[in-house]
Curated annotation (Swiss-Prot):
Record organism: Thermus thermophilus (strain ATCC BAA-163 / DSM 7039 / HB27)
Cofactor(s) the protein requires to work: Mg(2+)
GO MF term (any one): 3'-5'-RNA exonuclease activity
Transmembrane segments: none
Reported function: Involved in mRNA degradation. Catalyzes the phosphorolysis of single-stranded polyribonucleotides processively in the 3'- to 5'-direction.
Underlying gene: pnp
Name of the protein described by the UniProt record: Polyribonucleotide nucleotidyltransferase
Biological process (GO), any one: RNA processing
Organism placement in taxonomy: Bacteria, Thermotogati, Deinococcota, Deinococci, Thermales
Stored InterPro entries: ExoRNase_PH_dom1 (IPR001247), ExoRNase_PH_dom2 (IPR015847), ExoRNase_PH_dom2_sf (IPR036345), KH_dom (IPR004087), KH_dom_type_1 (IPR004088), KH_dom_type_1_sf (IPR036612), NA-bd_OB-fold (IPR012340), PNPase (IPR012162)
EC number of the protein: 2.7.7.8
Residue ranges of every copy of the S1 motif domain listed in the record: 633-701
Subcellular location(s) of the protein: Cytoplasm
Binding site for Mg(2+): D498, D504
Length: 713
């Protein structure tokens, strides 16, 4: 209870965000961590901890790891795994970890080499307010309170677009009707990260949404600053790694220019450029290394010169772009690399395409499956399945490297999700195309922009498969070089340009508008005009790519491929579902012996899947026969099943029979039914009447009007 001496009191900082309380608490839980903060938003609660190692590690990068841990008790569920405990993070947890990692990573000081671990644990999820946007807020607050050097704070918000108006932090229910799902993380001065899924939204609306998000996150930043002023620990002392003095770096840069660095950097081929650059670096460093009196180079300084050479390369590449408008492969800022496209490349795949842009190449494939192929989602959401899957594979050979294959990487999960969001907006409704659809993007070559090439290849493969998408989708990766109020926007960036730029963003969409956007900003606040110009330049490139795609395949194919499963649908009365299934599933098993799969939904919808159309048609006929209902006035070819003294029972179709009374068998008086009919005879009969108990009276249509119908008492 509150006030008990043994229970530490939490420090609470609170505000109202989109009509719901946002609370930051610290000082009560996980106190041995360098920084720990509990964040509550309505009934969604996450705990973030920040910890750094006491000593630096030998590395030339920031050793930061971010984990996003989902606890199933947060939604009152027991995990569905065999061990009934949480295992490896699922896709949503990986995406949430990346959403936290990307905006905090650029704010660590350059050269900081202490291991840093951020763990965000979801303790409660109210099924209304998604916990993913709380990850960056909680991680930022924990870092602010810790002794870890970090130039925060940051905050994150989600923006929806409903009825033409922006909605701050829409609930999961509101997102279902929103035209936009935009997550923005930023600092006071700048937007640092953007993730968006959109329903063909125009560029001006996106810029307005970004501005709206940045404005609305400011109170969260102020709340963290207030907490840090009162509670933050002193920052740890750390020593930056040794580097060359600035004057030696400058001398190395001038020497590199004299020896022809610019020409080496403008070698068109990635492989040739890498080899030429490595040889150039070796010669340059050997020349630049200080020599002893005996002429022996100071090998101890070689790592410093190698590190400085990377800075020299980055500086010269940026200079070429800013001052001369030249890029490493000789293109201008707005130029696309050469593109070639193939479709229908695999004989057995349900849809396939190869999209090649410069030295980036992706094989896209589509597989159509049944309802049984849907992915079961065992996460913190409501129990549901997923019918549209997009998977991205990035093997080491695509970059000419050797690397152990250790399963799916976080990067592969993130890129696959980006491609999925790009394509999702144009996918057909389930009632129009009831297949489970899996798109796979296998990267065969990579030199930048492979995720956007996956969007293009995946779209072409969908069209090749005959999936009736609403419009083609293309994607392009953009870059920005920004210096002293000078900005050059680069279209279709190389891997080399991705590393040297100040911002990279990937834009996918149709001719009508944007369907997905991902952005990472490494510099301060960018003017609105630059953001809009970048989006418009991306649109210009996207339209050119769509022109090329539509030249090869103008529209989805009208027919499915021969090996794709066929789906036939029909509706049966709910009360007859049991009849279709049969005792112990007997009837369904009999249908499956035809080589089909049968799915039956609670509303009576029956779907039949088979790669053999004739088998599917036969199964459909059997189900229709099982569930048919006789109608007054309809004529049937029936089979005599029983003879009685008062008439003959005729089977109209499986499960349904009627009585042909003795008075209706022939003109005149009939003494014995057996004189006119025998079991097994097939005759035409017409339904004359169905009583309230469902009993059917039949007549012979050829005798109608010649003998009066029987009257029931």
């Amino acid at each position: 209870m509150e006030g008990t001496p043994n229970v530490p009191q939490a420090h609470r900082y609170e505000l109202t965000l989109a009509g719901r309380p946002l609370v930051l608490e610290t000082g009560k839980y996980a106190k041995q961590a360098s920084g720990s903060v509990l964040v509550r938003y309505a009934d969604t609660v996450v705990l973030a901890t920040a910890q750094a190692s006491e000593t630096p590690v030998e590395a030339d990068f920031l050793p930061l790891t971010v984990e996003f841990e989902e606890r199933h008790y947060a939604v009152g569920k027991i995990p569905g795994s065999f061990m009934r405990r949480e295992g490896r993070p699922g896709e949503k947890a990986i995406l949430s970890a990346r959403m936290t990692d990307r905006p905090i990573r650029p704010l660590f000081p350059k050269g900081f080499r202490h291991e840093v671990q951020i763990i965000v644990t979801v303790l409660s999820a109210d099924q209304k307010n998604p916990p993913d946007i709380l990850g960056p807020i909680a991680a930022s607050a924990a870092l602010m309170l810790s002794d870890i050097p970090w130039e925060g704070p940051i905050a994150a918000v989600r923006v929806g677009l409903i009825g033409g108006s922006f909605v701050l932090n829409p609930t999961l229910q509101e997102l279902e009707e929103s035209q936009l799902d935009l997550v923005v993380a930023g600092s006071k001065e700048a937007i640092l990260m953007v993730e968006a899924e959109a329903g063909e939204v125009d560029e001006e609306t996106l810029v307005q949404a970004l501005e709206f998000a940045h404005k609305e996150m400011q109170p969260i930043l102020e709340l963290q600053e207030a907490m840090a002023r009162e509670l933050a620990k002193p920052k740890m002392a750390w020593t930056p790694p040794e580097s060359l003095p600035e004057e030696e770096k400058e001398a190395l840069y001038r020497l590199a220019l004299e020896r022809g660095l610019s020409q080496v950097l403008q070698t068109a081929s990635k492989g040739e450029r890498s080899r030429a650059l490595a040889e150039f670096a070796e010669r340059l460093i050997a020349e630049a290394l200080p020599k002893g009196e005996d002429g022996t180079p100071d090998e101890g300084k070689k790592p410093l010169y190698e590190s400085a050479f990377d800075e020299v390369v980055r500086r010269e590449l940026r200079r070429l772009v800013l001052e001369e408008g030249k890029r490493a492969d000789g293109r201008g800022p707005k130029d696309l690399r050469p593109i070639w496209i193939e479709v229908d490349v695999l004989p057995r795949a349900h849809g396939s395409a190869v999209f090649t842009r410069g030295e980036t190449q992706v094989l896209g494939t589509v597989t159509l499956g049944t309802g049984r192929d849907e992915q079961i989602l065992d996460d913190l959401g409501i129990d549901e399945t997923e019918k549209f899957l997009v998977h991205y594979n990035f093997p080491p050979f695509s970059t000419g490297e050797v690397r152990r294959l250790r399963g799916v990487s976080r990067r592969e999960v993130g890129h696959g999700n980006l491609a999925k969001r790009a394509l999702k907006a144009v996918m057909p409704k389930e009632e129009d195309f009831p297949y489970t659809i899996r798109v796979v993007g296998d990267v065969l070559e990579s030199n930048g922009s492979s995720s956007m090439a996956t969007v293009c290849a995946g779209c072409l493969a969908l069209m090749d498969a005959g999936v009736p998408i609403r419009a083609p989708v293309a994607g392009v990766a953009m870059g920005l070089v920004w210096e002293e109020n000078r900005a050059v926007i680069l279209t279709d960036i190389l891997g080399l340009e991705d590393a040297l730029g100040d911002m990279d963003f990937k834009v996918a969409g149709t001719r009508k508008g944007v369907t997905a956007l991902q952005m990472d900003n490494k510099v301060g606040g960018l003017p609105r005009e630059v953001l809009k110009e970048a989006l418009l330049q991306a649109r210009e490139a996207r339209l050119k790519i769509l022109d090329l795609m539509e030249t090869v395949l103008p529209a989805p194919r009208p027919e499915l491929k021969p090996f794709a499963p066929r789906i036939l649908s029909l509706k049966v009365p709910v009360e007859k579902i049991g009849l279709v299934i049969g005792p112990g599933g007997k009837n369904v098993r009999a249908l499956e012996e035809l080589g089909v799969e049968v799915d039956i939904e609670e509303d009576g919808t029956v779907r039949i899947y088979s790669s053999d159309l004739n088998a599917a048609l036969e199964a459909k006929k059997r189900i229709e026969d099982l569930t048919r209902e006789a109608k007054v006035g309809e004529i049937y070819e029936g089979t005599v099943t029983r003879i009685t003294p008062f008439g003959a029972f005729i089977s109209l179709f499986p499960g349904t029979e009627g009585l042909l009374h003795i008075s209706q068998i022939a003109p005149g008086r009939v003494e014995r039914v057996e004189d006119h009919l025998k079991v097994g005879d097939v005759i035409k009969v017409k339904v004359h009447r169905i009583d309230e108990r469902g009993k059917i009276d039949l007549i012979r249509p050829e005798l109608e009007g010649k003998i009066p119908p029987r009257r029931r008492k």
